[in-house]
Design a protein with these regions (language model features):
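Active-site gating loops and adjacent loop-to-helix segments of metal-dependent hydrolytic enzymes
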Residues: 54-74, 223, 227-235, 272-303, ...
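C-terminal functional module detector
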Residues: 20-21, 29-98, 104-139, 143-144, ...
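Bacterial signal peptide processing site
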Residues: 14-16
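Residues embedded in well-ordered beta-strands within globular domains across many folds
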Residues: 184, 294-297, 504
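A metal-dependent hydrolase metal-coordination microenvironment
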Residues: 120, 128, 141-279, 305, ...
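Sec-dependent signal peptide recognition
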Residues: 1-7
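C-terminal motif of bacterial Sec signal peptides marking the signal peptidase cleavage site
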Residues: 10-12
Length: 525
């Protein structure tokens, strides 16, 4: 890479401006088993402060369009470098960013990460002046691998949202750096996708995009996907539409898209809160015309003693399932910028037969969401398999059905986590005689990367379901999740939580699952 040159001083040759030249270049190589991977790299100076790059341009509190394209495929953001390819040559001391220099000459601590599947890497680098090319190798360690899934963030904002303004290419790089494979671009009342930007960045083999639209009204937000780019009514017909009208608009899109309720416990523009639902009474005071709901939503991604927002969201969701309203539990970031809520801070792992992004089997991916084949998480991996009895095959996973054996089933669980994710418990909930009931709480030993549990769970002889969650009370690192919880609400931060889509149990063995409004044939496997 050629040295960056910027006119600054005056030389002795005729009084012409002399160029300022960066005399040190940071050459980064982030790898997973020697293969370059997109990632984030934060530099921390001698005072312990992170190097902030760019400006806070959205309401003077958030960074949307104020980041700096500091090098090809590299975004200089408020919390560090965002590397789209894992390999980069970044100028130090002199650059075209505002303010400049983005990275002053000096000695830095380095922290690198790639979403939640990898352990953090920490080291040091000397970027003093006149050091030339400074090589920095960052080998990341995969803490866990979600086999047979695609990581998806299906509620994401970019340039077309007036409260984001992040350039679309930067959104692609940001998502790729956090290990997301499927992006649902869901700008407010705008149907769009990121396919063109992904192709321009040559990231087709890494990430793909689904065209989505977040229908945004005063009372609720609905995600609709996949939709045709540029389709949908004008925003003026949606802003002040009532709940019934917004659902009607959602179902007017051709092709029977997924209708997803976004952040229903956000307190504002939140369906459950606006309707005054307590999460238990039935029927709820709103239409049930949706396929999926954000149980883990980026702006409400926490449990604290005074506000167990995750637990409330799971309670709401289990009430729906218990009455036979089988919708998919989703986890999406709702990211708007580079500061408040970050890409993939809540995400989905969708079980698919073909996990490639190029080509991408969109129809199969959407079918998997509709079939509830999802684990949603803000940090840990949660594997759930259920069989009629110990050793029986095949087993049932998230969203599937199993037949009980003499009023019980055999449950195999495993939680895995990166080192920065602290877990405390696993909870198993079943549909009881009078509604959802906690069947078992299992303590997770501290500081173990992988923990398994198995045992028989009694379910009785009426058709039911089994839901499993895992969570912890220690917040995740703010630089990895964003600063919204602390800056806006003075909360410690995002806490780790995962939910597997419940497994249905044919307890009476009649070949059908009947509970509430549902009557479903148990497929032969």
């Amino acid at each position: 890479m050629k040295a960056l040159v910027i006119a600054a001083t005056v030389c002795a040759c005729g009084g012409k401006p002399a160029p300022r030249v960066s005399t040190t270049t940071l050459v980064v190589h982030v790898t997973d088993q020697a293969k370059a991977v997109a990632a984030r790299v934060m530099l921390v100076d001698a005072t312990g402060a992170p190097v902030h790059i760019g400006t806070l341009d959205v309401y003077k509190t958030r960074q949307g369009g104020g980041a700096c394209a500091i090098a090809p495929g590299v975004i200089g953001s408020w919390d560090g470098l965002v590397l789209g390819y894992g390999v980069a040559e970044v100028p130090v001391g002199v650059d075209a960013c505002t303010p400049s220099p983005a990275i002053p000459y000096g000695h830095y601590k380095v922290v690198a990460w790639r979403g939640i599947e990898y352990d953090r890497w920490e080291g040091e680098v000397d970027l003093s002046a006149d050091r030339g090319r400074v090589e920095l190798a960052i080998p990341l360690h995969h803490a866990w691998t979600p086999h047979g899934t695609m990581a998806a963030d299906l509620h994401v904002h970019a340039f077309a949202s007036d409260d984001s303004k992040m350039p679309n290419q930067q959104r692609v790089i940001a998502q790729a750096s956090m290990g997301i494979a499927v992006i649902g671009l869901s700008d407010h009342n705008t149907a769009g996708d990121l396919t063109a930007e992904i192709h321009e960045l040559h990231l087709d083999d890494v990430v793909t995009s689904i065209s989505s639209d977040e229908l945004t009204s005063d009372t609720l937000h609905l995600g609709v996907y996949p939709v045709r780019r540029g389709s949908g009514p004008p925003a003026s017909k949606i802003w002040h539409a009532n709940v019934d009208q917004v659902f009607q608009i959602a179902h007017s899109f051709p092709g029977n898209p997924i209708v997803q309720v976004n952040h229903p416990r956000f307190r504002v523009t939140a369906l459950y809160d606006q309707a005054g639902w307590d999460g238990v009474s039935w029927p709820p005071p709103f239409p049930l015309a949706f396929d999926a709901v954000e149980v883990l939503a980026g702006y409400t991604a926490f449990n604290i003693p005074s506000d167990r927002r995750f637990d409330d969201s799971v309670r709401d969701y289990y009430t729906l399932v218990d009455h036979g309203h089988l919708v998919t539990p989703m986890g999406n970031s709702d990211t708007h910028d580079f500061t408040w809520v970050l890409d993939g801070s809540a995400r989905n792992y969708v079980y698919v037969d073909d996990a490639r992004t190029n080509p991408f089997d969109e129809a199969a991916f959407i079918a998997a969401i509709r079939a509830r084949r999802v684990v949603a998480t803000t940090g840990p991996w949660l594997d759930v398999e259920i069989a009629p009895k110990r050793g029986a095959t095949p087993t049932a996973g998230p969203g599937q059905l199993v037949t009980a054996d003499a009023g019980g089933v055999w449950v195999d669980l495993r939680v895995e986590r990166a080192g920065f994710v602290k877990l405390d418990r696993i909870r198993i909930t079943i549909g009881g005689e009078h509604g959802p009931e906690l069947a078992q709480t299992i303590d997770v030993p501290p500081d173990v990367p992988s923990f398994g549990w198995h045992g028989r769970i009694e379910v009785g002889h009426a058709d039911t379901w089994i839901g499993v969650t895992t969570d912890g009370d220690t917040p995740l690192p703010l630089e990895q999740t964003g600063w919204y919880q602390r800056e806006k609400w003075k909360h410690p931060g995002v806490t780790p939580f995962a939910i597997a889509s419940p497994i249905l149990v044919d307890a009476d063995g009649d070949g059908r699952w009947k509970r509430g409004d549902a009557d479903i044939a148990v497929p032969k496997r």
